[in-house]
Amino acid sequence: MGAIDMFNDFVKLIESESLPVEAVAIADGDAIIAERHFVPDQDRNIYSHTKSYVSTAIGIAIEDGLLSLDSRLVDSFPEYVPSDAQLELGQITLRHLLTMSSGYNHAYLMNPDRRSGVGAPDYLRYMFSRRVEVEPGSTFCYSSADSDLAGRMLEQAAGMRLGEYLYGTFFSKLDQGWPVWECDPQGHPIAGGGIYMSLANMLKLGQVYLNDGTWHGTRIVSESWVKQASGKQIDTPYSNIWTCGYGYQFWMSPYEGAYRADGAYGQITTVLPKQGLVVAIQCPESGDFDNIVRPALHEHLLLPLTA
């Protein structure tokens, strides 16, 4: 059975079981080969899937000499460093932020907290006042604040906002428009989540990575960055098969060589390098993605594709 047949079987399951899915598609390195929408196609909030775009922007910035993985957070924002700053604060690097190992060891600035006003009005000042609990680089702790700090380091180095930088270096080259992006109280795009994207454009990110950093022959991001960002950089505490390691703002997936950009409620792009395929799905906030859709996606599409 081919990939399209497997896809069609999964679509039939969605319909017969009334699974809470908005859209699903498969692409190879060149084009979408199968796609199905259950609601009108539109840009939607893809939550933490955003983090993988920020990783890509940072990879481009590193290639351009604006940053390095060893760039220190405090060097980007010396004016925010408290007079009684911990030694550990000065040890936090871009690498630590990208691997969710800053040492804060707490899930700061996650979506519910942001929406309730935590950290406002100045996320940088808020995070610089938090205690670094463990040695940077020693412990994985998933936190949108780490992504936000990495994004602000890029903005500082590039001299522009994240949306502007990503448009010039990434989106415009993929024939995408200016990104709609939720911002913090000071107008900075939230690197931890909040970009709005169509299913087809989510797939494009995966296709660039599937093609080792190119889009229809044009180099977008270095092959070296693709391999680093999509490879396991740090172990993650095991809670289920989906927590099997983390790269630079990409999750590892439980299939050979596979990884994913993963946003809340089921906004996910999975890259399957061995099969030369990318699978993307969008789901509603009202659905139980983790307990209903994710197991079905695994058992009825991703496992058959990778068998």
What does each model-found stretch correspond to?
Residues 47, 140-142:
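Catalytic tyrosine of NAD(P)H-dependent dehydrogenase/reductases that use a Tyr as the general acid/base
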Residues 31-32, 111-136, 160-179:
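Short, charged, amphipathic alpha-helices and their helix-cap/turn boundaries
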Residues 227-279:
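Active-site Gly/Thr loop motif
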Residues 7-40, 69, 269-270, 276-280:
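A short, well-structured edge-of-sheet supersecondary motif
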